[in-house]
Amino acid sequence: MTNIRKTHPLMKIINHSFIDLPTPSNISAWWNFGSLLGFCLIVQIMTGLFLAMHYTSDTTTAFSSVAHICRDVNYGWLIRYMHANGASLFFICLYLHVGRGMYYGSYLSYETWNIGILLLLAVMATAFMGYVLPWGQMSFWGATVITNLLSAIPYIGASLVEWIWGGFSVDKATLTRFFAFHFVLPFIIMALAMIHLLFLHESGSNNPSGLMSDSDKVPFHPYYTIKDILGLILLTLFFMILVLFSPDILGDPDNYTPANPLITPPHIKPEWYFLFAYAILRSIPNKLGGVLALVFSILILVLLPLLHMSKQRSMAFRPLTQCLFWILAADLLTLTWIGGQPVEYPFIAIGQLASILYFLLILFMMPLTSLMEDKLLKW
């Protein structure tokens, strides 16, 4: 008799995705981040659901409702810190996942890559709106500054900002709509993740060598289920150490002060995972130019398949491009550091240089080096 997992309509889908899925035999730990991101999303949805049961999206009570969750709700402090630090963990996994895709040429699976970019943008939007909800000082001023960037759009900018605010400043209407969107977006992300997987399983996984692996596939279970479980255990260990020992290390102390429209914090900055983009935004003196650079710093990922000049898919056997890739990684860390610094010398100059280098590396240096490597290999 045929196994039920191969005949039952629902089990069949799970079977083809997680059990009998033909997987390259040589994929490394860098391929663990997909499952870790799925885990992060589930943790965020579950903790978020419990937080939403006690949270009130009103400007007068939002801050105190978060304090109430931490003080009076059973394990409320744990749920709140798991949700806040879960977002940081989500972005660590997300950036490593994208970096892996860039390194091993996964962007040549166009549909999977483009859905992935949509996922990245959706997660960024969700995280930004979630940061506004506790209604602390940085929540309020962060929301004011970032939404105000839309006013740089010619002709419709000012009207667009007021339409998003629901008034003439960030207020009750803004908070309520941000809560509504923050609640619904993770479910859209879940649907997009399923489409991401659907397209991935159409073409099959890439592998570190970048070569076709049809002749050497193994079933996903037990080989990669056990590998993913190991990744999950290590991630959970790191996560719980972060949540239980230093839950506020990645947050901003200003957010423990209730929002006050009359007092501007000395340094307005977003959460750490947006600092690289914020540094690129600040490095251009012109408002519209800064906004365009900010948007393009993420959307540049769409161009990667067009900028792939090498005859090899992966960077595994391309040492010169590898060097540039790691310079890019260091550059992004530099931008993250600069984004958290005040706007003064020498940080302005460092930020401008790092921003120029970021675009130069992706748009010119890496493609040209790829061509040069092909020439060196007499291809």
Swiss-Prot record:
GO terms for cellular component: mitochondrial inner membrane; respiratory chain complex III. Heme 1 (or BL or b562) is low-potential and absorbs at about 562 nm, and heme 2 (or BH or b566) is high-potential and absorbs at about 566 nm. This is Cytochrome b. GO terms for molecular function: metal ion binding; ubiquinol-cytochrome-c reductase activity. GO terms for biological process: mitochondrial electron transport, ubiquinol to cytochrome c. Binds 2 heme b groups non-covalently. Its main location: mitochondrion. PANTHER family: CYTOCHROME B (PTHR19271:SF16). InterPro entries: Cyt_b/b6_C, Cyt_b/b6_C_sf, Cyt_b/b6_N, Cytb/b6-like_sf, Cytochrome_b, Cytochrome_b_C_euk/bac, Cytochrome_b_N_euk/bac, Di-haem_cyt_TM. PROSITE patterns: CYTB_CTER, CYTB_NTER.
